[in-house]
């Protein structure tokens, strides 16, 4: 059974992420959605919140597992005995960074391969960063994220406004 890892911060999980999980789940026996701590970014949602949202959104997939991780992705891949990494490419601008990352990952773990998937056309423009900004400013993000995520974005905005 081919086991693949789809890593990301998923802050929050979007329809674009869901689309890639759906397509990866049809291609591979097991998809591990690996929600990263990502010390280089200041996440809007905590790791626990992001894992919970992803689990709730992806609950209908029998061959998908959602888990959080910290540290190097290649160490996580070794622990999971996974040799394939799935990465999404929305635009040409994503390619250069992802290409470099794939090369560095192969240098750390020569047995790993990176497979690039492009999202369906209707999801190519979705960015979790932009979704957060639209939600923060009170805009409608229902075209971009699952209803459960919309509710969490609303709750988070209230918490932030109350200084929690």
UniProtKB/Swiss-Prot annotation:
Keyword Glycoprotein: no
Cofactor annotation: Mg(2+)
Alphabetic keyword roster: ATP-binding, Coenzyme A biosynthesis, Cytoplasm, Magnesium, Nucleotide-binding, Nucleotidyltransferase, Transferase
GO molecular function, one term: pantetheine-phosphate adenylyltransferase activity
One of the GO biological process terms: coenzyme A biosynthetic process
List of residues binding ATP: 9-10, 17, 88-90, 98, 123-129
Origin: domain of life: Bacteria
InterPro entries: Cyt_trans-like (IPR004821), PPAT (IPR001980), Rossmann-like_a/b/a_fold (IPR014729)
Family, similarity comment: Belongs to the bacterial CoaD family.
UniProt-recorded name of the protein: Phosphopantetheine adenylyltransferase
High-level lineage: Bacteria, Pseudomonadati, Pseudomonadota, Betaproteobacteria, Nitrosomonadales
Gene name linked to the record: coaD
């Amino acid at each position: 059974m081919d086991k693949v890892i789809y890593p990301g911060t998923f802050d929050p999980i979007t329809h674009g992420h869901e689309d890639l999980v759906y397509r990866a789940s049809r291609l591979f026996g097991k998809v591990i959605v690996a929600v990263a701590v990502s010390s280089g970014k200041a996440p809007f949602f905590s790791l626990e919140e992001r894992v919970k949202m992803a689990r709730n959104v992806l609950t209908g997939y029998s061959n998908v597992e959602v888990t959080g991780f910290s540290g190097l992705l290649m160490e996580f891949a070794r622990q999971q005995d996974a040799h394939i990494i799935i990465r999404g490419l929305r635009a040409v601008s994503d390619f250069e960074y992802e290409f470099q990352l794939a090369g560095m990952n192969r240098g750390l773990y020569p047995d790993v391969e990176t497979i690039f998937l492009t999202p369906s056309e209707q999801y190519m423009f979705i960015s979790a960063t932009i979704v957060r900004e639209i939600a923060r400013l009170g805009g409608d993000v229902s075209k971009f994220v699952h209803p459960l995520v919309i509710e969490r974005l609303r709750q988070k905005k209230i918490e932030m406004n109350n200084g929690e």
